[in-house]
Every structure is written in C-alpha cells, then in structure tokens.
C-alpha cells in the first residue's frame, strides 16, 4: 500500500512518478509534455463518452480530452506555457550559460607550451626591469628622487635610454633562443622573426610595469614618464604624436588585466608572425602562430569563472595589429633622434 509520502511524489493527473512542478502542478514528464502540446493546438480534443474517462498511468493516452480536463482541474495553467520562440530563446540562453560555466580544458600539449613559455620568460625577463637601475639612471627617474648611494656618476638620459633598450632586446633574444620551437627554425628565419618582433615583445612585457593611475612605467625604483621620452636627447626626443599612440596602447592593454600566461602567449603570437620580411618557412611559422593563438583562446575561455571581457581575445588581436604600427613608427623615431641610433647598434640592426 502506497504511503502518504509516495502519493505526494506522484503526478496529480495520472499517478505516475512526478518529476517536479510544471505549469503550477506536480506532474510527470509525460503529462507536462502532453499539456504543452495540447494547449498549443488551435483546436482542443473532445471526449466521445461525455467526459467520464479514467485517466491513469495505463489509460492516460486513451482520451486526450479527459486528460486535458484533469490537468486543468489539478491547477495546470495555460498562461504559463511559453511560445515556441520564447522556449527556443530560453533553451539557447541555458545552453550559453552552461557553456560559460564549464571552463574549457587545455590539452596536455597546450599546458606544456604555456609552461615552456613561462619558464623562458621567468629566466630571462622575469626580473629584467628591476635591473634597469644598474645602467646609471639620472636622479630624476627615481620614484623618491633619491638615487642609491652606491651608484656611479650618472650619464645623460639618452645614454641610459640606449642602455636599457639594448638590454631589453638582448633579454628578448635570450627568451626566444630558449624556446625549442624557435630554435628548430632555420637561422635565417630566426633572424627575420626577431628583427620583426623584438620591439613588439619588449612592449608587451613592458606593459606589466605600466601604472594606469599615474600613466608611468614603474621599473624597480625607477619611474619613466611620457615627458622623459619626449626629452630623451638634449636636441630632440620622440614625437608627441608617437608617444600618445604608444601610451594609449599601454593603457588599453593594461586595462584588460592579463595574467602572465596571456602575456607570454601574446608575445609568442607576435614572434611567430609568418608575414615578416625575409621569412622562408611561412607555412611552418603560420602553424606555430595558430598553435599559440588557439592556446590563448583556450586559456581565456578556461578562465570564464573570473569576470572577464567576453571579447578579450578579439581585443588582443586588435592590439597586436596596433602594436605592429607602433613598431614601424618606433624604427623611424630611433633613426631620427640625434645620437641615439649610434649608441644602440643592436637596436639599429633590429629596426633596419
């Protein structure tokens, strides 16, 4: 004999096992679907036996009219049924919500790639900016305007600028040489890729030091401002238009709040650009860039539990294109700042 608790779990229409409240009544899946289908029809069913048919788990299919009437008597409401369009929209939103709540898993190969990039980055660029102080910076660059007492006499700003930029490029070269996939390419292509991407990688990594509040670069105890770049040489500095473009890029990228794996993958995408002048193995390099891009996409999607911009990947692609323009303008600027290119033969070679 069924207990009171069992009866409460049964469908109020046919007595089958209920799955929940549907359209305001506790019903089974069968009666839920029947009610939705029947009410959606323009013509209702009729009973040939004066509405006296039994509606049970076994007999429920015999008379749609009596079954519908019992649904209504049990409290099921027609006004709670969504239209086909509304139902499709709700299901689509539910599917989208499930997709967003389920982080995309990185493959083993992608995990290994990220670890390789992070390892090379840590070894060669992890403490790069803290070392700028060894290049005898002018006193005004210090955040507290107090140079360290152990420093040798300072050199002009242009000399310090040349030294730190050469140092950054050297570290970028070490970073790339630490990547097995880069070393596997012909030496000619390695040179072409480095000449094209070295400055871009410098700016991607430098972005981690950019302070949105002050619009300065904070490198260890040093602070670099837009005014410093404008007066890097006693005679002339970087053009204001170029600096505004550069600082806008850094502000936009910094606001995206990238994680370290996203920074290194972005740098790798810049490195493996198959359209650099002089590249011969374009197909192989294109495949490498696609691998970096897919890994970056997967990583971003895997972080969806964090409040991230859903257009983040698209924005990063746009910033890479913007960085390409900055790179070209930077090369022109270097050549036209008096005395600067002669102090930086490595960077002059990169930008030539």
Curated annotation (Swiss-Prot):
UniProt's post-translational modification comment states:
Phosphorylated at Thr-38 by PKC, dephosphorylation of Thr-38 is required for nuclear translocation and activation.
Q: Which InterPro entries match?
A: NHR-like_dom_sf (IPR035500), Nucl_hrmn_rcpt_lig-bd (IPR000536), Nuclear_hormone_rcpt_NR1 (IPR050234), Nuclear_hrmn_rcpt (IPR001723), ThyrH_rcpt (IPR001728), Znf_hrmn_rcpt (IPR001628), Znf_NHR/GATA (IPR013088)
**Residues of the NR LBD domain:** 109-352
- Residues where Phosphothreonine occurs? 38
- Entry's Gene Ontology molecular function annotations: estrogen response element binding; nuclear receptor activity; zinc ion binding
Per the record, the zinc finger regions (NR C4-type) lie at 11-31, 47-71
- Keyword tags: Activator, Cytoplasm, Cytoskeleton, DNA-binding, Metal-binding, Nucleus, Phosphoprotein, Receptor, Transcription, Transcription regulation, Zinc, Zinc-finger
Q: Name one GO biological process term.
A: regulation of transcription by RNA polymerase II
- Give the primary localization class: nucleus
What is the documented function of this protein?
Binds and transactivates the retinoic acid response elements that control expression of the retinoic acid receptor beta 2 and alcohol dehydrogenase 3 genes. Transactivates both the phenobarbital responsive element module of the human CYP2B6 gene and the CYP3A4 xenobiotic response element.
Its family remark reads:
Belongs to the nuclear hormone receptor family. NR1 subfamily.
Known partners and oligomeric status: Heterodimer of NR1I3 and RXR. Interacts with PSMC4. Interacts with ECT2. Directly interacts with DNAJC7; this complex may also include HSP90. Interacts with CRY1. Interacts with CRY2 in a ligand-dependent manner.
Entry remark concerning the domains of this protein: Composed by a short N-terminal domain followed by the DNA binding, hinge, and ligand binding/dimerization domains.
Q: What is the protein's given name? A: Nuclear receptor subfamily 1 group I member 3
């Amino acid at each position: 004999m069924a207990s009171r608790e069992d009866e409460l779990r049964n469908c109020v229409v046919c007595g089958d096992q209920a799955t929940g409240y549907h359209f305001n009544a506790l019903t089974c899946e069968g009666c839920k679907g029947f009610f939705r289908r029947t009410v959606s029809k323009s013509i209702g069913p009729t009973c040939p036996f004066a509405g006296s048919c039994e509606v049970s788990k076994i007999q429920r299919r015999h008379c749609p009219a009596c079954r519908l009437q019992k649904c209504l008597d049990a409290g099921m409401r027609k006004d709670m049924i969504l239209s086909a369009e509304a139902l499709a929209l709700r299901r689509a939103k539910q599917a989208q919500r499930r997709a967003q709540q389920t982080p995309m898993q990185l493959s083993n190969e992608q995990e290994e790639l990220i670890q390789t990039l992070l390892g090379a980055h840590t070894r060669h660029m992890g403490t790069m900016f803290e070392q700028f102080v060894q290049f005898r910076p002018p006193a005004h660059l210090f955040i507290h305007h107090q140079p360290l007492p152990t420093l040798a006499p300072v050199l002009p700003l242009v000399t310090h600028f040349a030294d730190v930029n050469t140092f950054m490029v050297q570290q970028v070269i070490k970073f790339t040489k630490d990547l097995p996939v880069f070393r596997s390419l012909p030496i000619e292509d390695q040179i072409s890729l480095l000449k094209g991407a070295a400055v871009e990688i410098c700016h991607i990594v430098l972005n981690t030091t950019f302070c949105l509040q002050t619009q300065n670069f904070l490198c260890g105890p040093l602070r670099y401002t837009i005014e410093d770049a404008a007066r890097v040489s006693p005679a002339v500095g970087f053009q204001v238009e170029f600096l505004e473009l550069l600082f806008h890029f850094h502000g936009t990228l910094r606001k995206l709040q990238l994680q370290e794996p996203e920074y290194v993958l972005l740098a790798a995408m810049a490195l493996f650009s198959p359209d650099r002048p002089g590249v011969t193995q374009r197909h192989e390099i294109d495949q490498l860039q696609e691998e970096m891009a897919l890994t970056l996409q997967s990583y971003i999607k895997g972080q969806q539990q964090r409040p991230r911009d859903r257009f983040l990947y698209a924005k990063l692609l746009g910033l890479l294109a913007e960085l390409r323009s900055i790179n070209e303008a930077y090369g022109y600027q270097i050549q036209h700042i008096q005395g600067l290119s002669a102090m930086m033969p490595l960077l002059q070679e990169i930008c030539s």
